[in-house]
Amino acid sequence: MTAYALTDSWTMTRRELARWARQPVQLVVNLVFPVMLLLMFGYLIGGGRGVNGEYRDYLIPGMLALTMAFGLEGTMIAVTRDLDKGVIDRFRSMPMADGAVLVGRSAADMLQSAMALVVLIGVGAALGWRVHGGPVAFLGAVGLLLLFRFAMLWIGIYLALVAGKPEMVQAVQILVWPIGFLSNALALPDTMPGWLGTVVEWNPMSHTATAVRDLFGTPGAESGHVGAALVWPLALLAVFFPLAVRRFGRLSR
């Protein structure tokens, strides 16, 4: 990416950050909602069966992965709103690099996702959760989580461009939910019916959650999933990033 494109992308990122200052409620909701889910699942379903060690130690890494899959509606709504209101057309009339709007939006979303991880890890620590791996493994786990988020983000951007209207986002967002709940984020596949366990084991998010548990040093965590946790998001990016860019290019003509 050229310096010209980077400058335009940073301008679009600052535009999104300024929106946070004007409308902080959405940012707060996106940071608080994962904490509410953690407390709900941790205390209401805290005795999950089939999990080695304490359920809290199993749950929190899974919730970190789940958080990276959810919360895409903010980005999807922002993209569709700009399309619906003709903002994209106004930007197109300016000497601006192609795709800078999407890159700026994705950069702001990644910053918000990093903040959500910090909040959730802090709450987990307050609840007694501890990381048993070293600092390098910890950073590796955070990197895998953000990589998974980045892949999910571009899936969301593509779906938003296909939807085209803000009112369609909620319907499209429902398509993302199975990725989160049909995973091992909350329970072991061994405790599920055979066919469902197979689906869960093939879910890309399950590989991320399992790899993160391993890197965090969770007692009883399964090893050998770091490679899959890298390959799956990269494969999704290889598919949906060009699809989103191509779709955006067609809409901008």
Swiss-Prot record:
One of its GO terms (cellular component) is ATP-binding cassette (ABC) transporter complex. It is found in: Cell membrane. InterPro entries: ABC2_TM, ABC2_TM_bact-type, ABC_2_transport, Nod_factor_ABC_transporter. PROSITE patterns: ABC_TM2. Disulfide bonds: none annotated. GO terms for biological process: response to antibiotic. Pfam families: ABC2_membrane. It is a multi-pass membrane protein. This is Daunorubicin resistance ABC transporter permease protein DrrB3. The gene is drrB3.
